[in-house]
Amino acid sequence: MITKTSETFQFDAIDDVVSDIAKGRIVIVTDDADRENEGDLVMAAEKVTPEAVNFMATHGRGLICVPISNERAEQLGLQRMVAQNREAQRTDFTVSVDAARGVTTGISAYDRATTILAIANSKSSPEDLTQPGHVFPLRAKEGGVLRRAGHTEAAVDLARMADLQPAGVLCEILHDDGTMARLPELMEFRRKHSLRICTIQSLIAYRRQREKLVTLEQVVKLPTDYGDFDLHLYRSLLDGMHHLALVKGKIDQDKPALVRVHSECLTGDVFASQRCDCGNQLHAALRQISEEGNGVLVYMRQEGRGIGLAAKIHAYKLQEEGLDTVEANAKLGLPADLRDYGLGAQILFDLGVRRFRFLTNNPKKVVGLEGYGLEMVEQVPIRVEANPHNKKYLETKKKKLGHLL
């Protein structure tokens, strides 16, 4: 199966890519244009052969590395290459290694394959490797691509999903002249060598839709100005962050619940800032849910549309100098909106919500909740009054972010 992600480029379905990984085949994994915008050859480490290493060295031309889990790195006694990682993408290199036995110089395709197999072997110990060497292990973040959207994590995730050891092999794809191959060239490379290709973004979406990423820790009663709610405390299994859900009444899977997914805004929600409409939307949603007698407000800890409190305050300063909210984020090197609604969707599902009426002015939230076993039956707008301080902000949300105001 092939999925079409743009008018020009077609990518393979993750299930098909995982199937090839399980069979010991090489695939291409690409990342986002906002990141490295590169493609890597990727395969499972325990399936590596001298021929595969030679293919990567000959046709990929990049550095051949072996992404592994942190647990595996500790088992093998692999220390980080540097104490302070200043590499742009924070790729977590360990010291380089060779196999302790069965190799000569360590650089041949045969020798490197032998070393990679030793790294992937669950029975290997630190004594089975020598340092330094000609193979470069990389430590993947716990949580894989759901924690860090990198090729390192993608390689380990794909191996795990194929029921293999959490270790991969990767190599960047370069042009003949040594420059990085970009997406058009990667598609031609894929056709020439009959390889499957996927994006890290599609792998993230695949995992988010299939894995439970939140756990319920506590439920308490919460009396408010808008009536009594049940306050549910959830913890993300990815980063330990806590999120909240205020539930009114009893959730009935057959009756669409009134739902609001609200991202934290300290300045608006707590200090009643007039620079935004967040606090007004929060209270309007609580009022509407209370009047309905049945519904959920999910409170996500995604301050500043996901960029964090400090970055938001810096963006405020740029707005005072004349930039709008989107331009200010861009000036800081940040996307206009970094929020992820996948965890919110999983919280709703865990609460028993299946069909819902969605309190939102943001179409992106609708898209963000799709694919999690939830069905939106109605989009309900939240109407709040503008003021002289947030008028430009609201106009920018409407024109540049597509909000329905």
Please annotate each region the language model reported:
Residues 1-405:
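Catalytic domains of riboflavin
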